Amino acid sequence: MRAIELPELTQWCTSLGTSLGACAEAWQGFGEWMSSGNGINVGGLTEFFHREQHEYLLQSAQWCQLRQTEVIGDEFSLVEFDMASTTIDELKACSADFKSVISEDAELNAFGGWFDTDFRGSEADPAPQPVTLTTQPESTTHWAQQVFMVHPPMNVQVGDTLEGTVKCARQRLNHRLMWVQLTLTLNRAGVGQVGPERTLNYRID
C-alpha cells in the first residue's frame, strides 16, 4: 500500500463532491414534490440519505489503474499469508502498523492498495526458480488497484512521515467483502505532528 497523489483523482474528488451536492439538491426537490404532491414529509429521512451518499461516494474503495508517477510515498506491507498453512480464522481480520516517508511535495488525496503473490514452493519442495506476480501500478497484469480516498486531502512535503495503523475485517453479511479502517498522523522534521490524528473508514464492496 502506498500514499498517492492522483491528478485525475483530484478532479474525481471534485466530481464526487459535486455529485454529493447534486444528490442533496435532488433529494430536496424530491422532498418538496412528495410534500406538495402527496402530503408526505420525508424530512426524517434526510440525515440517513446524506450519510448513505457520503459513504458510497467517499468511503468506498474505488477500482483504478494507477501509474508509478502518482506514487508519492514509501510502500508498506499490511499482511502476509502462507496459503499452505493459513487458517480461515486468520483471514477474518488483520491489523498492521505502517510508516511511509513522503518523496515529494504534493497533495495526498488517496492511498493505493494492491497485492503480490510469491510462488516459492514449500519447505519440502521449494521452487527451483521462485516467481513473484505483482499487481502494483503499471505491472503486466489484468488486475488494477484499489484506491482509498483521503477527504479532505492533506498537503505533504518531502521527508514527511505518515504513521498509523490499518485494520481490515470481513463484512458481516458478505465475507468476500471487507471493512478497512486507517488511522494516521502526519509528522514533519523540526515541527512534529502536523494536524490532528485522522481515522478514515472504508468499505471494499
Question: Where in the sequence are the language-model features?
Answer:
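Class I SAM-binding transferase module
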Residues: 1-167, 171-205
